[in-house]
Amino acid sequence: MFEKRTWIRLPRNVVVGHGVLGQTIEAVSELHLTGRPLVVSSPTPHDVAGKQVVAQFEDEGYDPSEIVIEEASFDAVQQVIDHASDIDAGFLLGVGGGKAIDITKMAADDLGLGFVSVPTAASHDGIVSGRGSVPEGDTRHSVAAEPPLAVIADTEVLAEAPWRLTTAGCADIISNYTAVRDWQLAHRLKNVHYSEYAGALSQMTAEMLVESADSIKQGLEESSWIVVKALVSSGVAMSIADSSRPASGAEHLFSHQLDRLVPDGALHGHQVGVGSIMTEYLHSGQKGKWRDARDALAAIGAPTTADELGIDDETVIEALTTAHQIRDRYTVLGDGMSEEAAIEAATVTGVI
């Protein structure tokens, strides 16, 4: 008897391009959201775009409220929940990078309210996915939530963000290639459910970004266009799979372990990018495609070595040998690799 079923939750509106921040009201109106809007941002994004979003709602006769959060934490999520309850918010808008959007996403999910994502930096695929990431102590928690009802990504705003945030977003996408390989491996060895559609979309997105790496340059709005479209595709792949598997494999375990060992280390995207160089080597050996990943990262100015991450060699090896302990997710790391094997992988690929 056939009993398969799936429920794919996707954004209804994805508005990307030059000056689209000015279309926020139009995009929200099409969603038929009612009630008082709550705009959530962090300090810099509040100045860059949050004030403009609030002003748009005021001009249209809404009574918007706003809250500026200082850090990504479960306490901040609760602050947003409490504020939204106090003002009887009808829907939430997250304006910013990963911090504000993840917190808004999780708060909206807890409240059962609609959520609109307004990224000010193309730094990771959380701008469209149904997962939030929040640190707690030396651990970073990945929490399931509803994806945004709409994404409004103004490439003019994104192009003004610090370039390192854009290169982190690129690296996050490039790492999808090894994430999919890990997913396929888990399917073959552990019978983990694998979605051909989600896997193909994620892999294609990574490959297209690698091919476009030479065109991604600082100061070009076109670069933001390329990167944000890739981030949207990656988020959609996760929604189709109802899992972070299409975009999170051993390279993400490596990054999360680095977060534990070096809490104020490099950007998430940069860490997974370096991780993907080594995990691709583990998948395909010395003649594999790890050079393609490394060269693409180098072309956009993203780190490819421990030194460029600002992390010492010993910590990289420790993270690689213990990354499998982060969560119960089968990857090429299996039940752990020896220190000798980790040193070889990091040395051959030039990471250390």
From Swiss-Prot:
Residues annotated as binding substrate: 125, 172, 256
Instruction: Give compartment(s).
Output: Cytoplasm
Q: Which reaction does it catalyse?
A: sn-glycerol 1-phosphate + NAD(+) = dihydroxyacetone phosphate + NADH + H(+); sn-glycerol 1-phosphate + NADP(+) = dihydroxyacetone phosphate + NADPH + H(+)
The protein's required cofactor(s) are namely:
Zn(2+)
Q: Which UniProt keywords apply?
A: Cytoplasm, Lipid biosynthesis, Lipid metabolism, Metal-binding, NAD, NADP, Oxidoreductase, Phospholipid biosynthesis, Phospholipid metabolism, Zinc
Q: Spell out the family assignment given in the record's similarity comment.
A: Belongs to the glycerol-1-phosphate dehydrogenase family.
GO molecular function annotation: glycerol-1-phosphate dehydrogenase (NAD+) activity; glycerol-1-phosphate dehydrogenase (NADP+) activity; metal ion binding
Name under which the protein is recorded: Glycerol-1-phosphate dehydrogenase [NAD(P)+]
Q: What is its main location?
A: cytoplasm
Class of enzymatic activity (EC top level): oxidoreductase
Annotated Zn(2+) binding lies at 172, 252, 268
SUPFAM superfamilies, A to Z: Dehydroquinate synthase-like
Note the Pfam families from the entry.
Fe-ADH_2
Residues that bind NAD(+): 98-102, 120-123, 129
| One of the protein's GO biological processes | phospholipid biosynthetic process
Cofactor binding summary note: Binds 1 zinc ion per subunit.
Q: What is its EC number?
A: 1.1.1.261
Q: What does this protein do?
A: Catalyzes the NAD(P)H-dependent reduction of dihydroxyacetonephosphate (DHAP or glycerone phosphate) to glycerol 1-phosphate (G1P). The G1P thus generated is used as the glycerophosphate backbone of phospholipids in the cellular membranes of Archaea.
According to UniProt, this protein's pathway is:
Membrane lipid metabolism; glycerophospholipid metabolism
Give the domain of life.
Archaea
Q: Which GO terms describe its cellular component?
A: cytoplasm
Recorded hits in InterPro entries, A to Z, give:
G1P_dehydrogenase_arc, G1PDH, Glycerol_DH
